[in-house]
């Protein structure tokens, strides 16, 4: 459920909040409570919710939106225009991005294709861990299926995908593990075969928890 604490967890994992307990391990390193800049250098990328407000730069074209993360990390300070375009073109092909020209405004793309540009932005930095918050928010059904396919493809390539969604169908399609939050705490850690609508609803509404003595009664 919205406000249960899942978004806040991803924010702590990306250095936007301080964690009071637990730890975040990535690529063999303890990343707990590092600042955002340091976490990004350990190949962690983040796609926040509401891409129009938090991810895209509407005044810039597609190519510049694609390269933003690399530039901010200092990975591509002197890259030639040709190399920029070649790199973008490869990601465009790999992600089946539908865009007329890399010079087109990012806002000329559909929601699904904007999201692909944002994902490509982090993949271009060699991100191994992707933190996604409602990755298909505001995207049509056909584009959602493409995003699902892309996430599964990335997982099969060895990427770690941690995503928050309010849609149970997305969890069933994409997740091999599901953490259910209730009032800022993890109420359940479900394996793939345990993920179903009824079980998730019981945990996310507090009717059932991992602690039987605290279960609520209907």
Regions from the PLM with identified roles:
Residues 1-218:
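Glycine-rich phosphate-binding loops of nucleotide-dependent enzymes
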């Amino acid at each position: 459920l919205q406000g249960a604490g899942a978004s806040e967890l991803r924010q702590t994992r990306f250095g936007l909040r301080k964690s009071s307990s637990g730890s975040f391990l990535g690529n063999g390193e303890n990343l707990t409570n590092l600042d955002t800049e340091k976490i990004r250098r350990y190949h962690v990328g983040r796609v926040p919710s509401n891409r129009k407000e938090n991810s895209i730069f509407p005044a810039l074209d597609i190519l510049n939106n694609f390269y933003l993360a690399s530039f901010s990390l200092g990975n591509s300070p002197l890259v030639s225009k040709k190399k920029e375009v070649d790199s973008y073109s490869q990601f465009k092909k790999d992600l089946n991005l539908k865009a007329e020209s890399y010079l087109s405004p990012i806002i000329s793309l559909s929601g699904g294709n904007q999201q692909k540009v944002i994902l490509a932005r982090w993949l271009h930095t060699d991100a191994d861990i992707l933190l996604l918050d409602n990755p298909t928010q505001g995207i049509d059904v056909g584009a959602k299926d493409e995003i699902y396919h892309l996430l599964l493809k990335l997982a099969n390539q060895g990427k770690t995908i941690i995503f928050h969604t309010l849609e149970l169908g997305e969890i069933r399609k994409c997740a091999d593990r599901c953490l259910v939050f209730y009032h800022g705490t993890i109420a359940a850690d479900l394996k793939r075969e345990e993920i179903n609508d009824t079980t998730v609803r019981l945990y996310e509404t507090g009717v059932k928890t991992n602690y039987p003595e605290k279960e609520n009664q209907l």
